[in-house]
Design a protein with these regions (language model features):
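Flexible loop and strand-edge segments within Gram-negative outer membrane beta-barrel domains
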Residues: 7, 186-187, 194, 198-200, ...
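Transmembrane beta-barrel wall of Gram-negative outer-membrane proteins
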Residues: 159-185, 195-231, 242-260, 317-323, ...
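Outer-membrane beta-barrel signature, preferentially recognizing the C-terminal barrel domain
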Residues: 238-258, 306, 361-367, 414-433, ...
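Gram-negative outer-membrane beta-barrel transporters
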Residues: 323, 380-382, 386, 394-395, ...
Length: 675
């Protein structure tokens, strides 16, 4: 039996997760397709992006404060992941990773989140750990009225937070427009022991507008504008806070869908500005004076702004070659300019002021990356499918000044103005329907990644987790991964299950290595480390998702995730979370909804002491939520109440820097009016 290429796209189960937040569908890996799944990911109307991603398969969060947590996927983080917004490349402007790309997005302006694991993420660029693509919300063309709007307000007692959400839109003829905005303000929260955690406050604004024009039934032209600004953001686990972090995104997209082919083209620009600030911290240090043998009192403050601008474009085309094959091609390019500065003001008490010391912690650099991605999907039968894809990226780094050369000359580096690297990837995916409810998948793959700007050109970057200064290495090799991933899926009307396991063998693994020759800069460091390629490492991960509905209105949802990592030196990989389990039980009856959640994690005793890790204890917390829907002729009012951390447990997770307790019991109240 032959299967057309059009049917391929409907029948085949891609090796990625797509969680659609508005359309209420979860793709491929586990096609749950019901509202309870959306409710599992979005625990309330004002769920932050951190709260949402923490509920995704394989995702953990590195926490430095109560805002802007850094996502980790199956043990991979930072430059090992592709994190994009509607396919657009974007990068944080903070050398301390205080502004991951996810921090500039709100769930209210998201349409869906797509996950791809391991090396099979070449559609978004060569990488080894996977990809997270956050698709921006589109105008609501399913509304019964040409004009629609919604207003939500809410508060959380643990941090006295204030949340306001507004969304509106208008459709007429061939034009569609949507607008949504969020305001959040949170005071320092209290942990489970009743202690207020200083420097855990934040305030932010986010607004997104989209316009779409439909010239005919097969074409669409869309424009997006997004602006996000956060102020007074505290980071209790770090020696500095953030006075201002803002981002702007502009995009123009054209899409055409025909029976035998589809084409999408996009051009975009985004800009990020980030300012670290220690003006509210205790900046008095006591330093031993080797000359006098006495202890000097030193007041030190630092100004640390960072800038990151990205211009990019891509074209994607998908063609039906014949009844069994569909070909997808993508050509893309982005140009990223980055610069991070530090001005250090030092004052030895009782002595004249010293002149400020200036350096560039990221030199003024422009990175230009051009890539080509090709993929073919073949249907051998209505039960067996194979996808083969490959990608090549060419990266050119161009230093814009001699500052980096002067700084690195101290370490006997003579830097050229230009560096180039070529990376490649190739991946296979086999999908076999053993029977109608059973699906088996197998994915072998290989990929490489280019070193990040921090790993390549970082200059005296202090890491508060292990207490070391870090310096980049301009001559790092590309990091490489050989991956194997298997999955088993089962689905019927009442019960659905997805089990996946992956194994990654890494070579030329990049990490900071102690260097006793180069002195550290900061008074309070344990020493200095230089980024180097180490021979190798291994990462194993297992994820289990299931949902069960024994009767109408009653739903059980479970997510279990586990990661194991080890260096070739037989030491544990640092920052690997222990086994974690999430369970949700919900019940719906007419306008009422009730839900109780449990989040538990085991003790993590596989730690790397050299990198500042300590054993983290196990924990288990419960959350409760209820809501009632008031229905009117043309509108609806939702009233939602909940208690998070029901038993006021004092706990922290293994990836939480500084072992600072998370929020204690909180009573939450939310109202949402939709017209």
């Amino acid at each position: 039996m032959t299967l057309s290429a059009q049917k391929i796209s409907k029948k085949i189960v891609c090796c990625c997760d797509t969680i659609a937040l508005k359309e209420i569908t979860v793709s491929s890996v586990i096609p749950l397709n019901n509202k309870q799944v959306e409710n599992f990911y979005k625990t309330n109307y004002f769920s932050t992006i951190d709260n949402l991603t923490a509920h995704l398969e394989g995702i953990s969060l590195i926490k430095r404060g109560s805002y802007a947590m850094e996502p980790q996927m199956n043990g991979f983080s930072g430059g090992q992941l592709n994190i994009t917004i509607s396919g657009m490349k974007m990068f944080g402007a903070c050398t301390d990773k205080m502004d991951p790309v996810t921090s500039y997005i709100e769930p209210s302006n998201l349409k869906s989140i797509t996950l791809e694991h391991g090396t099979n993420s070449g559609f978004y660029g060569n990488n080894i750990g996977g990809s997270i693509d956050m698709a921006l919300q589109e105008p609501n063309n399913n509304s019964k009225h040409s004009f629609y709007s919604a207003l939500s307000v809410g508060t959380e007692s643990v941090s006295n937070s204030k949340n306001i959400l507004l969304s509106t839109g208008y459709t007429k003829n061939k034009w569609e427009w949507g607008l949504n905005g969020v305001y959040r303000k949170s005071e320092p929260y209290k942990d489970g022991s009743g202690k207020t955690i200083p420097f855990s406050q934040f305030e932010k604004y986010n607004i997104h507008s989209v316009v779409r024009y439909l010239p005919d039934s097969t074409s669409a032209l869309k424009g997006d504008v997004l602006y996000d600004m956060a102020t007074n953001v505290g980071y209790p686990a770090l020696p500095m806070d953030v006075s201002n972090a803002r981002a702007s995104i502009f995009a123009l997209e054209y899409q055409r869908n025909q029976r035998n082919y589809t084409v999408k083209a996009k051009v975009y620009y985004n800009s990020v500005y980030h300012v670290m600030d220690d003006s509210h911290r205790d900046s008095l240090f006591f330093v031993h004076n080797k000359t006098t043998g006495k202890t000097d009192s030193v007041i030190m403050r630092m100004d640390m702004p960072g800038r990151c601008n990205t211009f990019g474009s891509f074209v994607v085309a998908s063609f039906r070659l014949n009844d069994k094959n569909r070909l997808t091609m993508k050509a893309d390019n982005y140009i990223n300019g980055s610069l991070a500065e530090m001005t250090m003001h030092m004052h030895f008490v009782g002595k004249p002021l010293e002149s400020p010391m200036y350096l560039q912690t990221w030199p003024d650099n422009v990175r230009n990356v051009t890539g080509l991605f090709i993929q073919n999907t073949t249907a051998f039968s209505d039960r067996l499918f194979m996808t083969l894809n490959g990608r090549v990226d060419y990266c050119l780094d161009h230093l814009q000044s001699d500052v980096a050369n002067r700084e690195f000359s101290v370490f006997n580096y003579n830097l050229p103005r230009k560096f180039d690297k070529l990376t490649k990837s190739v991946n296979l995916s086999f999908q076999y329907f053993i029977s109608q409810p059973f699906l088996f998948t197998f994915e072998p793959g290989y990929s490489e990644r280019i070193p990040t700007i921090t790993e390549k050109f970082g200059y005296y970057l202090y890491n508060a987790y292990d207490g070391y200064d870090y310096i980049g290495n301009p001559y790092l090799k590309t990091e490489k991964s050989f991956m194997g991933r298997v999955g088993m899926m089962y689905s019927n009307q009442r019960f659905k299950l997805n089990l996946s396991q992956s194994c990654n063998f890494l070579t030329d693994y990049i990490m900071g290595i102690n260097n006793s020759v180069i002195p550290p800069m900061n008074f309070y460091t344990n020493g200095l480390r230089v980024f180097q390629n180490v021979p190798g490492a291994k990462l194993l991960s297992t994820d289990l998702q299931s949902t069960y509905s024994p009767m109408d209105g009653l739903y059980f949802f479970n997510l279990t995730k586990f990661t194991w990592g080890r260096l070739d030196s037989d030491e544990p990989l640092p920052l690997i979370p222990p086994l974690k389990n999430l369970i949700s039980v919900s019940y719906e009856k007419r306008q009422w909804t009730f839900r109780i959640d449990n989040e538990s994690a085991l003790r993590q005793n596989r730690i790397n002491l050299q990198y500042g890790e300590t054993i983290s204890p196990s924990y288990s917390i419960f959350n409760f939520k209820s809501s009632y829907h008031f229905m009117f002729s043309d509108s609806m009012l939702d009233v939602s109440t909940g208690i998070t951390n029901l038993f006021n447990v004092a706990y922290y997770e293994h990836l939480d820097w500084g072992r600072i307790y998370r929020p204690g019991r909180s009573i939450d109240i939310f109202f949402k009016y939709t017209y």
